[in-house]
């Protein structure tokens, strides 16, 4: 059980790393620049979407 949990944690961490490095496959809606914090620092909200977070 511990091995399964460790593998699961590693998969989650790698998926989060890939998400932040390459953006998301779907547009991230936002109202202000603060809504785009999950995409990284300095990402701006334009036309209701986080620009650099969307592929």
From Swiss-Prot:
Question: Chief localization class?
Answer: secreted
Q: Where in the cell is it found?
A: Secreted
- Domain of life, per UniProt, equals Eukaryota
InterPro entries annotated for this entry? Scorpion_toxin-like_sf
Tissue specificity as recorded in UniProt: Expressed by the venom gland.
Q: Which SUPFAM superfamilies match?
A: Scorpion toxin-like (SSF57095)
Keywords attached to this Swiss-Prot or TrEMBL record, sorted alphabetically, are: Disulfide bond, Secreted, Signal
Q: Which GO terms describe its cellular component?
A: extracellular region
Signal peptide as annotated in the record: 1-23
Q: Give me the disulphide-bonded residues.
A: 30-45, 36-50, 39-53
Give any extra note attached to this record: Negative results: does not show any effect on Na(+), Ca(2+) currents, nor on voltage-gated and calcium-activated potassium channels.
What this protein is called in its record is Neurotoxin X-29S
